[in-house]
Amino acid sequence: MTAEGGVQYSKIAEIKGPLVIVDDVENAAFDELVEVETKDGERRLGKVLEVGNGKAIVQVFEGTTGLSIAATNAKFVGKVMEMPVSREVLGRVFDGLGRPKDGLPDPIADQFIDINGEPMNPEQREYPKDFIQTGVSVIDGMITLVRGQKLPIFSGSGMSHNLLAAQIARQASVIGTQDDFAVVFAAIGVQYSEAEYFRRSLEESGALKRSVLFLNTADDPAIERIITPRVALTVAEYLAFELGMHVLVILTDMTNYAEALREISAAREEVPGRKGYPGYLYTDLSTIYERAGKLNGKKGSVTQVPILSMPSDDITHPIPDLTGYITEGQIVLGRDLFRQGVYPPVNILMSLSRLMKDGIGEGSTRADHGEISNQVYDAYSRAQEVRALAGIVGKAGLTEIDLKYMDVGDVFENEFLSQATDENRTIEETLGILWKIVSKLPRNEITKIKDKYVDQYYKEE
């Protein structure tokens, strides 16, 4: 039966989990948008996951609760899901499917763009090399974020990743340029209180004016979580590559996204992979993470900070494990530091920004940045070794230089790593604290910094 704007079918073979299986379907296409109508006239959106042998498997975004085989119709609308985009999306709050959630009307659209995006031609990619200042010392100083990079945060259940995500969203900026900067924030499967915190945090700081907020809460259908990062990245790509803005995309929590993917896979009775996740989890995650970058001839950039909570703090779990293969480093939050009350509790010895070397130094941050960072990494690593030794032989068994390294570890955690959630430090302040840490050591222990920088910045205590 042909309906206005599409083809309508009423022969539903089966409803299983979030899926509706439609019989006797002709000419349906993969990813095609479907309107599923209930007996009460309620319309729910879905998309085609699989077509073959006259059947179509439809994934219903709002869930299948209340649907019956006898009284459900499915209209195949003949197009893929698209997100309306324009400059007017800035300052707006949307739900996980891209519908307004702030009580305001739909923004006037300049374009309608397929949420799956266009793959970036590797030949057209430009190497990321420009510094983004987050105002968080440990990131700016030791795990530097670069425009066009994808740098995930690996956290654990109950830790302070949401505070860190909101702080980065409020404070992030590009320095040394007049280019426009925007933040696209997508909350995926978060609690209502967390969603409200993100909204209030951006509103009260004034950062919402340059931001676009997508909120998918825990009581929304799990299947909606598959769509949320894609609509967010569609908006980010439009702002970056059509309007020439530098866009930071924060996605939290990607673990909830992967759980939704596992739910769909189980409903389709696919052969499970590691821990029940589908075998294509790596490929699916790459379709999200690889949408970060810069393009030759385009002024803007898309930078991603995906956040995921590691089940049981297990960094070898499939989600962080596969994420690490695709992205360019990781920021790992440590449970021990969190228990000590350190914020942000970043374990720098497990963290890395693979593109840091290209975004720092003279002309970007400061000429001594790379060397002072390496020296502090070395000193903090030595401090951890000394702490372990002190746990065995006691402080009385330590040498004078060992005690100095212990002091370095304490100053690093209490003055550099720790900062208030509303404290926005410049890169100059961050580097100043790093030199204060190094100055706790005798000059002959400083082996990774050129003498000219030591002469300029070192102040022995």
Curated annotation (Swiss-Prot):
Biological process (GO), any one: proton motive force-driven plasma membrane ATP synthesis
InterPro entries hit by this protein: ATP-synt_VA_C, ATPase_a/bsu_AS, ATPase_F1/V1/A1_a/bsu_N, ATPase_F1/V1/A1_a/bsu_nucl-bd, P-loop_NTPase, V-ATPase_su_B/beta
Pfam families recorded: ATP-synt_ab, ATP-synt_ab_N, ATP-synt_VA_C
Gene3D superfamilies to which the protein is assigned, alphabetical: 3.40.50.12240
Compartment(s): Cell membrane
Keywords (A to Z) from UniProt: ATP synthesis, Cell membrane, Hydrogen ion transport, Ion transport, Membrane, Transport
GO annotations of cellular component type: plasma membrane
The keyword Secreted appears for this protein: no
Superkingdom field: Archaea
Subunit structure, interactors included: Has multiple subunits with at least A(3), B(3), C, D, E, F, H, I and proteolipid K(x).
NCBIfam families from the UniProt entry: PRK04196.1
Function: Component of the A-type ATP synthase that produces ATP from ADP in the presence of a proton gradient across the membrane. The B chain is a regulatory subunit.
Name this protein carries in UniProt: A-type ATP synthase subunit B
Source organism (scientific name): Nitrosopumilus maritimus (strain SCM1)
This protein's encoding gene: atpB
